[in-house]
């Protein structure tokens, strides 16, 4: 059944009830539960191209793309063929394979990294990068920004302390104070806060980690103005000046914001490089895969070459690396141009529809990924993002869902498209926007 104004949800609702009996909250990642928007989470049965089909047979244009990885759309035939051939050869060997070498070479050809180590999740990548930074520098303090998400690493699930440049407190039950006692949390895009933190703690700071363009509070681009380049360039220079490592988290933006990730939009232009980078999502082609990489002298500190320990049973497994390699080889400049054009069309139409409905909003982007904030802009940090009207977004979300468009079920996430989003898919989104904008207007708080 094609999605329409009133959608059946009985099958999804029944599956959700079964799931809640055996899984906390009925889901394996919290945002999937629809708690932020209400209603019945859709259980997806299949996906192809730009479209999802749920357990009730409803079809949706997918503007989540598995939270970023599906750059080429779902069930891309060439990726499927490569994966099928790899599966036929065996699924995991616990030994080195050629695909992991080829994928590392492909990543190093696009991103400014000299060595790459594979892991199985973005959380593992950031956790390992921080351990390596501490091992390399002999220091213990880590700096991060409020609103930037780096996976569920204990030391990074931190909330800002009771003053600027103070040490953090745990951001969730289950994280002891000792885990965040060496983490500084600063407001994003705030150069003065960064300078103050390094002035007070610079000789103890092992690294500063940031999302290259935050997407987990909605898309909040790094400030592009300022002498010597944008905010990321300023961070790179500040870290270098104080002997700390600059860790750029491109789990979301890597090979998604552009062919070279967010770095291709700022660092490649301004002439700076991170010391370490983390990757995930797109580089796994829809499979569990992530990586961290960087300067050869830093990466050489990893075991077995150096003393900093890191390992993983399924790290670099042949199925995930084959899928990632096939995806990156197919991700040409034309792919990014197509996605960018489709994203621009939707961004413009969303803004027009919301303006006509009288809904205060701002649309922000980092390359091909973007967010619609239902608040006055610009949104420069987590405090700004927190002002978005979540009730209005929930109404907007459900109006789009009822018309066959699957948006992130949270006001604080990025929207993603793929090369499979053709004219029909884009037009479906455009047709749904006016009704959704009016629903948002009616629900404004």
Curated annotation (Swiss-Prot):
In the UniProt record, does the keyword Isomerase occur? Answer: yes
Q: What is its EC number?
A: 5.4.3.8
Q: Which GO terms describe its cellular component?
A: cytoplasm
Pathway given in the UniProt record: Porphyrin-containing compound metabolism; protoporphyrin-IX biosynthesis; 5-aminolevulinate from L-glutamyl-tRNA(Glu): step 2/2
Keyword tags: Cytoplasm, Isomerase, Porphyrin biosynthesis, Pyridoxal phosphate
A GO molecular function term, named singly, is:
glutamate-1-semialdehyde 2,1-aminomutase activity
Q: Report the subcellular localization.
A: Cytoplasm
Recorded catalytic reaction(s): these are: (S)-4-amino-5-oxopentanoate = 5-aminolevulinate
UniProt-listed InterPro entries: 4pyrrol_synth_GluAld_NH2Trfase, Aminotrans_3, Aminotrans_3_PPA_site, PyrdxlP-dep_Trfase, PyrdxlP-dep_Trfase_major, PyrdxlP-dep_Trfase_small
- Residue(s) carrying N6-(pyridoxal phosphate)lysine: 281
Cofactors that this protein relies on: pyridoxal 5'-phosphate
**Predominant localisation class:** cytoplasm
Q: Is Glycoprotein tagged as a keyword?
A: no
Checking Gene3D superfamilies in the record gives: Aspartate Aminotransferase, domain 1, Type I PLP-dependent aspartate aminotransferase-like (Major domain)
Per the record, the GO terms for biological process are: protoporphyrinogen IX biosynthetic process
Q: How is this protein organized at the quaternary level?
A: Homodimer.
Concerning its family, UniProt says: Belongs to the class-III pyridoxal-phosphate-dependent aminotransferase family. HemL subfamily.
How is this protein named in the record? Glutamate-1-semialdehyde 2,1-aminomutase
Q: Which organism is it from?
A: Nocardioides sp. (strain ATCC BAA-499 / JS614)
Gene this chain is encoded by: hemL
